């Protein structure tokens, strides 16, 4: 079933670094100690306000992470924090905006790994350099992807292989949506179709929620996106989750089998969200923002709130985030080449 995919199993994205850093955080720094340490710092340079820039539509996973952290961002970093959604070009508009912002810490990027680790392999003229134009601050949360289908697909279809079989019989309806062309969900769907020898047509959207709305409205058959983005629609019975992308069943979706369980051994993926500042941001600003983000992510309200969207908090140091990005960028190159994606495609 996996004929034509890379010979060696593709490791889950970043899971090695993510699991270790989160364990280290939990073991080495409790929330109370962290907050106490922050309270002892001098906050004379606290900003009047800060903007967290998210590159996808309101209601999606990126928006959720941004708003949860903004609500709890330690007041020592900024007296207030707001979220601005700058959609377009698969998240590139948001990154360009932050790239050209003043490096004073007032403009913060929240982005999934895809925009920084995958796009360099898929766009010949990417308008930013993920390493040269941005300063890593902290990872925020880790999540897995899900494959869901809407009313276009018969209720008898309950698994990914059954979906592919239905697509073979109904080639005109064999399609799926993703939050952006060249994103991880795009490639997961493409690899799934390739593994099942199905011509699965991709439809790119500006975020997962617009794709889901078209799916539950019967305009497209399926959507591949962060599993948490489907939660409210699953609860309302408007769509069905056929598979998740983790190496093991998800903490928040224990009843849904993974793609690897269903025979697609190479399709095991997780992804992270990370906070970045513009290049040349002063180190004291980077460290203060890192401390503020860690404090926010240590809040039980944030932990519980992100869990509603199937997200697990995962704060890191700036160096850990930089290492994760480097590893994922290197890992995605061969996979993108295997799919044969081009910017025009």
What residue spans do the PLM features occupy?
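An extracytoplasmic/periplasmic, membrane-proximal ligand-sensing/linker region
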Residues: 13, 45-49, 194, 261, ...
């Amino acid at each position: 079933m996996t004929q034509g995919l890379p010979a060696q199993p593709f490791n889950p994205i970043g899971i090695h670094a993510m699991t270790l850093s989160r364990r280290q955080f939990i073991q080495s720094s409790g929330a109370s100690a962290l907050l106490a340490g922050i309270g002892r710092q001098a906050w004379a340079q606290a900003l009047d306000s800060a903007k967290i820039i998210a590159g996808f539509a309101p209601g999606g996973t990126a928006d959720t992470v941004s708003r949860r952290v903004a609500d709890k961002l330690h007041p020592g970093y900024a007296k207030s924090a707001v979220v601005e959604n700058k959609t377009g070009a698969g998240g590139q508009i948001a990154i360009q905006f932050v790239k050209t912002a003043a490096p004073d810490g007032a403009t913060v990027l929240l982005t999934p790994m895809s925009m920084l680790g995958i796009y360099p392999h898929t766009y010949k003229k990417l308008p930013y350099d993920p390493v040269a134009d941005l300063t890593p601050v902290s990872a925020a949360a880790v999540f897995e992807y899900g494959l869901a289908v809407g009313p276009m697909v018969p209720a008898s279809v309950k698994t990914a292989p059954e979906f592919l079989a239905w697509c073979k019989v109904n080639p005109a309806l064999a399609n799926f949506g993703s939050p952006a062309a060249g994103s991880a969900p795009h490639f997961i769907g493409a690899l799934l179709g390739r593994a099942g020898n199905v011509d699965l047509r991709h439809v790119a959207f500006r975020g997962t929620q617009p794709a889901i709305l078209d799916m539950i409205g019967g305009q497209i058959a399926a959507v591949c996106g962060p599993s948490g983005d489907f939660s409210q629609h699953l609860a309302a019975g408007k769509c069905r989750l056929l598979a998740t992308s983790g190496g093991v069943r998800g903490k928040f979706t224990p009843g849904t089998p993974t793609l690897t369980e269903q025979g697609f051994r190479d399709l095991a993926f997780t992804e992270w969200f990370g906070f970045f500042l513009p290049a040349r941001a002063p180190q004291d600003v980077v460290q203060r923002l890192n401390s503020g983000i860690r404090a926010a992510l240590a809040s039980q309200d944030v932990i519980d709130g992100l869990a509603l969207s199937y997200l697990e908090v995962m704060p890191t140091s700036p160096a850990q985030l930089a290492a994760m990005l480097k590893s994922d960028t290197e890992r995605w190159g061969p996979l993108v080449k295997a799919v044969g994606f081009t910017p025009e495609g």
